[in-house]
Regions:
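Nuclease-adjacent, charged terminal/linker segments that flank catalytic cores
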Residues: 1-83
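Conserved catalytic cores of phosphodiester-cleaving nucleases, focusing on short active-site segments
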Residues: 99, 103, 119-154
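Hydrophobic, Leu/Ile/Phe/Ala-enriched alpha-helical segments that form helix-helix packing faces
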Residues: 47-48, 99-107, 162-166
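A structural signal for well-ordered alpha-helical scaffolds and beta->alpha junctions
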Residues: 40, 92-97, 129, 158
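Acidic-basic catalytic patches of nuclease active cores, encompassing PD-(D/E)XK
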Residues: 80-122
Length: 177
């Protein structure tokens, strides 16, 4: 079978879980994806052969990650309604994955990516000058906005994230790596 020759005819529950996780979090290590969602090696290979997934290496380590291709992101958006996260870097995204795995299904289903948050503030508040957080979710009726802070963030960038959360009316949480 050549890449892109056919599409998935039927999504299984494990496929949906894996594709949503990849769409929401960016880069995921293969073993983590398999352990968390139960997706099989064969199914991962099928998704790679269909050009929905590809393996990438972290430039700073020998770690290998899976991520959605453009075709995969389009498929996840069209079929599952997930606005896919624009990945930064595997190490950054691995912190998002770690957070995601400790959430309830309801919290995961309330997940909004940075792309969605940017569109919301643009549409609802008419602002395009605020930098949204990496993601948000609802827990106990409260909207939590989470930002993964790396060593190259300036104080100004962090303030922009806080300003965004204040404009949206939620709770700000940051994770420093």
């Amino acid at each position: 079978m050549r890449k892109g020759d056919h599409k998935i005819k039927k999504l299984k529950g494990k496929d949906v879980d894996a594709l949503k996780m990849l769409g929401r979090t960016g880069h995921v290590q293969k073993d983590v994806l398999k352990d968390y969602t139960g997706i099989s090696e064969n199914r991962i290979n099928t998704l790679k052969n269909l050009d929905y997934l590809r393996e990438v290496y972290d430039n700073n380590s020998d770690d290998k990650y899976l991520r959605l291709t453009k075709e995969g992101r389009d498929f996840v958006h069209e079929q599952l309604g997930v606005v896919c996260y624009k990945s930064n870097a595997p190490v950054h995204d691995s912190q998002i994955v770690e957070y995601y795995m400790h959430m309830t299904k309801e919290e995961q289903d309330s997940w909004k990516t940075e792309t969605e948050l940017h569109q919301i503030i643009k549409d609802d508040l008419g602002r395009d000058d605020v930098s949204p957080t990496d993601f948000s979710y609802v827990s106990g009726g409260e909207v939590i906005y989470v930002e993964i802070i790396t060593s190259n963030y300036s104080n100004g960038q962090i303030e922009e994230k806080i300003e965004f959360v204040e404009a949206m009316g939620g709770t700000y949480e940051e994770i420093r790596i």
